[in-house]
């Protein structure tokens, strides 16, 4: 029986659209889901005064044990060094904050190194049916769970002043080529330093020289990135290429730009 008011009028049960899970999880609600993955991190990062980041990419499968364990220790060490360097630049603004994909392996090592150095760190996690779970070294208010890979990658690029890319698989390669494309096409509104960590690995996995030799990239594109094989070398590359003026804090977000075509 339908509920009736005292006047005999039927009372209808209604819900606000944004509180309706059936709508929010539907195809029609997709634009709202995408927008929420932009606005929610934006608000949290601004409230935490996170100005810019140094992003660590790398495999979730590289842990403290196993044949590639040295990369875990190096990522942990480098993240600590980056954090102490950032603290020496400014203790009043959150500059060059270590950021990772929020999962295990190299991502965990980066967040761990930052925490052990007494700094903050950011985790942009992705919901997957396997492998990816937030690591234990993340701060709750700086940990973000994404449904969409492209929104997660947008946030990596938005704040990054530098990206250090450790050995990894499909996900790491996806992130590497995305950021190389953004830098090559000058779509980022500010300079970004890219460091490939582990030169023997990267030279075996990706033959950049062959790409240039075949003419599908220019020889100048080989200068889009640096190689490093130890934390001290990687840190020095960052110091030489990332310039932070604490008197003029960086904008909260790196703006995308489309270079003007000139004849």
PLM features per residue range, with description:
Residues 34, 77, 81, 109, ...:
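Alpha-helical scaffold segments in soluble metabolic enzymes
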Residues 100-166, 170-173, 177, 202:
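Phosphate/pyrophosphate-binding betaalpha-module
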Residues 46-49, 89-93, 115, 135-137, ...:
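Solvent-exposed alpha-helices and their adjacent loops that cap or buttress functional pockets
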Residues 162-165, 175-200:
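Membrane-associated lipid acylation/remodeling enzymes share a hydrophobic transmembrane-juxtamembrane segment
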Residues 3, 8-12, 21-124:
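Glycine-rich beta-alpha loop segments
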Residues 39-59, 147-165, 180, 184:
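Glycine/serine-rich loop-strand microenvironments at binding/catalytic pocket rims
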Residues 115-116, 178-183, 210-213, 242-243:
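Short, solvent-exposed amphipathic alpha-helical segments in soluble enzyme
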């Amino acid at each position: 029986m339908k509920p009736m008011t005292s006047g005999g009028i039927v009372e209808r049960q209604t819900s606000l659209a944004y509180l309706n899970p059936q709508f929010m999880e539907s195809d029609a609600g997709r634009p709202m889901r995408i927008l929420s993955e932009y606005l929610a991190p934006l608000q949290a990062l601004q409230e935490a005064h996170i100005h810019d980041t140094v992003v660590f990419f790398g495999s979730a499968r590289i842990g403290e044990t196993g044949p590639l364990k040295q990369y875990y220790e190096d990522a942990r060490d480098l993240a600590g060094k980056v954090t102490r360097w950032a603290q020496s630049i400014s203790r009043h603004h959150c500059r060059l904050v270590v950021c990772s994909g929020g999962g295990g392996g190299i991502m965990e090592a980066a967040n761990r190194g930052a925490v052990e150095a007494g700094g903050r760190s950011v985790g942009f996690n992705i919901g997957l049916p396997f492998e990816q779970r937030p690591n234990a070294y993340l701060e709750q208010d700086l940990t973000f769970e994404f449904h969409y890979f492209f929104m997660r990658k947008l946030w990596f690029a938005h704040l990054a002043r530098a990206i250090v890319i450790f050995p990894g698989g499909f996900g790491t390669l996806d992130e590497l080529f995305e950021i190389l494309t953004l830098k090559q096409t000058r779509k980022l509104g500010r300079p970004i330093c890219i460091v490939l960590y582990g030169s023997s690995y990267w030279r075996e996995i990706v033959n950049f020289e062959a790409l240039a030799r075949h003419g599908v990239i220019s020889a100048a594109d080989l200068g889009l990135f640096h190689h490093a094989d130890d934390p001290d070398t990687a840190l020095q590359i960052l110091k030489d290429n990332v310039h932070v003026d604490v008197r003029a804090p960086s904008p909260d977000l790196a703006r995308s730009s489309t270079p003007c075509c000139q004849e």
